[in-house]
Amino acid sequence: MKILHASAEYFPYTKMGGLADMLASLTKEQSRTEEVYVALPLIGKLGKEPNWTGKEVGALLPQDAKEETIAVSLLAKARFREAIESGVKLYFFDSELFSGLNSIYGQADEHYRFAIFSYACYALSQILQVDVFHAHDWHTALSLTLQKNSTKPIPSLFTIHNLAYQGDHPFWMTGFLKEDPFYLITSPFDQDGKCNYMKAGILSAGQITTVSPGYREETLREPNGFGLSYVLKKRKADYTGILNGIDPDEWNPKVDKRIFQTYHLQNWKEGKRKNKEHLYREIGRPNVSLDLPLIGLIGRLTYQKGFPTFLQAFLERRHLPHRYVVLGSGDPETENAFFHLSDMMPDVFYFYKGYNESLAHQIEAASDFFLMPSLFEPCGLNQMYSHVYGTIPIVSRVGGLRDTVDESIDIQFKTGIVFEPNDKSSLGYALERANDLFVSPERDHVVKNMMNLDWTWTKRKLEYDRVYKIAIELLE
């Protein structure tokens, strides 16, 4: 089977969140048995220099583009450049729209940029003559509408990674697209008087998935549908929740080259202690006791991730002996609060603004617990990384966290600490339970349960194969 994925993110080239990790690990697994391609923008600052093959693909104009328009002009000057990564063929969209960017998101005209990128992805799918076209999130959703309206549509799948981001904008911002004979702004795009790419993707795709069964259920009702639950209900029969997986070559304490000391189930205590000692030296906190529980937090400092609730709970439970290492960036107020705590309580709290892949691995390996107080979480990957690294996750009971972390009364099944509702009292009580667990013999059983879990893509790839088959049968 020939599969083309279209995405704004792909690790390690354009990573802003879990989408990049998910797609890189999924396609790596798929490439073992299928012919896999990925289309992504070529921005000015990539996380890694691609392994270019020298092959290029041009002529990106859809066959029915007969008039000279802005979109046609931009596509005529663009091309895809091929590279290889872990057996996957990557097609970087080389266009003046993206070449000057240091970050894939955040531009005022990003709706315009991703509209043109979606045109190009649609054209590439026709050129490569793939069997399945798989688009990810709103950035590539317009390509699904083009597929649906094509005289030769390709079976398609749309994966929703985060319904909170919908690519909605005033119609005038991409009004120029009305001029193109192969693009029509019609009712699928209209949501509350705005052009909504996510809605168009949901209504246009042959099949729809999201990244956990729990998040699928949540998005079928408001407020978790962010205004689109009624659209998803229309496609409920075609909507599937499939948990993400992780790459065992990338996230595995047995072979991780980014951590100070590799370890496994039989020596996890020794391994984590050495990694904790190394991390404290690296962040300038060499005098912190290794016998105190360390809690790691990694993520974008956004409303979704629940950091304000954490701050409230932390201040109310500051008598607990926990130490914290936080890696992330985002909301300025949250950043300032974390910097303040880091300055005022240096032996208790450390904050690194930004994202650092090596530090992320070191935090997972060194921490005793990993906190995810998300208000909603489509899937989450860090709780899976934490399981593999013997780092007990403390999570809110939402979305994919609910599907993957179990605070069972039966010690044989316990794989973390879960709290609800998501407020300072519930989170504070969860922190107290973590403190008790840290010194309890029960901790050994929990870590064993976690490190024996299988979060690889082997089973999940088969679930995607099943959905691909349904999409193909719809067009036969």
Swiss-Prot record:
* Catalytic activity of the protein: [(1->4)-alpha-D-glucosyl](n) + ADP-alpha-D-glucose = [(1->4)-alpha-D-glucosyl](n+1) + ADP + H(+)
What organism is the protein native to? Leptospira biflexa serovar Patoc (strain Patoc 1 / ATCC 23582 / Paris)
SUPFAM superfamilies from the xrefs?
UDP-Glycosyltransferase/glycogen phosphorylase
Q: In which pathway does it act?
A: Glycan biosynthesis; glycogen biosynthesis
**Entry's EC annotation:** 2.4.1.21
**Gene encoding it?**
glgA
Question: Which UniProt keywords are present, listed alphabetically?
Answer: Glycogen biosynthesis, Glycosyltransferase, Transferase
Residues holding ADP-alpha-D-glucose: K15
Member of which family? Belongs to the glycosyltransferase 1 family. Bacterial/plant glycogen synthase subfamily.
User: Could you identify this protein by its name?
Assistant: Glycogen synthase
